[in-house]
Amino acid sequence: MGQSTNPRRVADNEARAKLRMIRTSPQKLNLVAALIRGKKVERALADLEFSRKRISKEVKKTLESAIANAENNHGLDIDSLVVSEAFVGKNLVMKRFRARARGRGAKILKPFSELTIVVREVEEAA
């Protein structure tokens, strides 16, 4: 009699955002993701704002999306949010060809990544 709803994949005090097809290698993206893991969201946003890595702008957008999901979709308090998880996965690899000397060719790999950020609401000990 109708479709049953799927259970939430994250806990009730969590929200997440996912960004796919990021044009950078997972290794480089993981350096920026490690920068924000376990931090309060205000501190993580500040760190990403002043990071010199090119990809930090897209990570910041994804973190802002996770914060907006927490506030609007799950009714969480944004002042008590912490980045509980930030993990990186591999996506496709575009393969290109570069002509070299004497009729040879070299392979160029252009990797893509994906990023998932989970924010959790924590009670602050007073």
UniProtKB/Swiss-Prot annotation:
GO biological process terms held by the UniProt record: translation
GO molecular function, one term: rRNA binding
Bilayer-spanning residue ranges: none
Keyword Nucleotidyltransferase: no
Keyword Kinase: no
InterPro entries: Ribosomal_uL22, Ribosomal_uL22_bac/chlpt-type, Ribosomal_uL22_bac/org-type, Ribosomal_uL22_sf
Gene3D superfamilies: Ribosomal protein L22/L17
GO cellular component labels: cytosolic large ribosomal subunit
Main function: This protein binds specifically to 23S rRNA; its binding is stimulated by other ribosomal proteins, e.g. L4, L17, and L20. It is important during the early stages of 50S assembly. It makes multiple contacts with different domains of the 23S rRNA in the assembled 50S subunit and ribosome.
Subunit structure: Part of the 50S ribosomal subunit.
Record family assignment: Belongs to the universal ribosomal protein uL22 family.
Listed name of the protein: Large ribosomal subunit protein uL22
Source species of the chain: Maricaulis maris (strain MCS10) (Caulobacter maris)
